Amino acid sequence: MSKKRPHREDYSPSYSNLDPIKKSHHPPNLSPRRAEYVAIRGALDRNHHQFQQPQMGKRPTFASYIDTPNLPLKIKLLCEIIATTLSSSVEKVLDETGIMVSQDDVEQVLKLSYEYPGPAVKFFRWSGLQLNDKHSPYAWNLVVDLLGKNCLFDAMWDALKSMKKEGLLSLATFASVFSSYVSADRVQEAIMSFEVMDQYGVSRDVVALNSLLSAICRDGKTLQAKEFLSIARDTIRPDADTYAILLEGWENAGDVASARKTFAEMVTDIGWDPGNVPAYDSFLTTLLRGPEGMRETLKFFETMRDRRCYPGIKFFKVALEDCARNSDVRVAELLWESMVGKNDCRPDTEMYNLLIGLHMYLKDTERARKLLDDMVYYGAFPNSQTYNLMFQFLLKGRKLKEASPIFSEMIKNECAPNHENCCTAIRVYIDNGDPYMAIKIWKWMIDNYKSDVEEIGNFLVVGLRDLKRVPEAVKYAKDMIDRGIKLNSSTLSKLKQSLSKAGKGPVYDELLRKWKTR
């Protein structure tokens, strides 16, 4: 195996039909408005970089064969050759292995070789000889993406030319190009790639436009996406997805004012559409996190609801979290009814837990219990958090008749009571004169928690003694000693008083001997 070399060494793909990119790759004939936009944005970008301190480019994190479990030996060997061999030697080393590859093998290796673009492209060429140059479209797309993500744009465009000759170009290919340029902070070149894509046989339609806008917005450049849309809409009419992409961009930026403007434009342009859930989802989530919070959000939510338009699960989850923080059960129930009753949007266990916790906090046990019982009908299932919430608040409110069956139910459903709830329960049941439930919980606790049980164990023994249950107190004191749980001398002293008073001195003597030997 050759000596390991720097990542960037010899990055040229050297593929027979991949020529260096020429300026003709940029759009030859832009409309006046588009040309003006590109010129202005380019000048602004140059200005920005001129006055910034030089910075290292964003270095993407690539998937590695080293971190991929259960990788077939052949794939691992090929990846290792690419990662540790000079580009000039890759094909020779591959030949010496005698390995035969399939289209699927090529795809797997390329996906794990982004860190080494030069050798990866050499591998692509080498494997093409075995496959009679019948690489899959996906493998070609991986090469384009691999080159683009390493900012090897000349070679990337040469690969695009080769794909064009083979009739393999698709929107997915250009989506990769857009993403690579944007992630390299070269938005204008992403836009120019969009402008020329029809020259490569790929339609420059609204789906392609949305792909470009999505790449720009994902990188936090929603303002530039919006600016370009104002130009592109002269020839391509935006659709619901266009606005959903922009609104998600404003959501990620936390830009409430821009979100309002885009939402208003959307309603004017395409009207109200019950199917446009992602747009409503992002818009309401943005408002909720804005300065006016729930008040403004509810105003827009009710406007949507009147038109039978609803957001998705993301908004409802964030809104329920807000209601729980502010103990706002009225709004929580209004949203819940809209979500479950009218929108047929199925809440998950986490959302049920939020509402159950809110009702338990406000001491509405009956409503919380109904929510717990209803969960399974909506495809959600209670977990340990659900039961522990119920158990915690029932104990806090001293509603022990309701708490006892909850404990039994959670054990039956293998949802473990947490340590804190077990300790609280033992204390509450002892304080309320119910040693049977206290003992039941203690038995479960010492079988499932192997540490931090000393304090509550001593409390139980003393509590049983105070409830005139001295035989049980002695029994569990002995059991604690046998299990290696420290029995405090103060606990032992109290047992001595009770046993001496009852004329059970020998019982105490036996307990003391056991205690001393441990």
Can you say where each PLM-predicted feature lies in the sequence?
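Inter-helix linker motif
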Residues: 131-132, 166-167, 201, 220, ...
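The canonical alpha-helical register within tetratricopeptide repeats
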Residues: 126, 162, 196, 230-231, ...
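Alpha-helical solenoid repeat scaffolds, predominantly canonical TPR units
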Residues: 123, 159, 193, 228, ...
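Pentatricopeptide repeat
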Residues: 102-106, 136, 140, 156, ...
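N-terminal targeting peptides
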Residues: 1-176, 181-192, 196-200, 207-210, ...
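Residue-level detector of the short coil/turn that links helix A to helix B
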Residues: 151, 185, 220, 254, ...
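C-terminal interaction modules of eukaryotic adaptor/scaffold proteins
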Residues: 459, 463-518
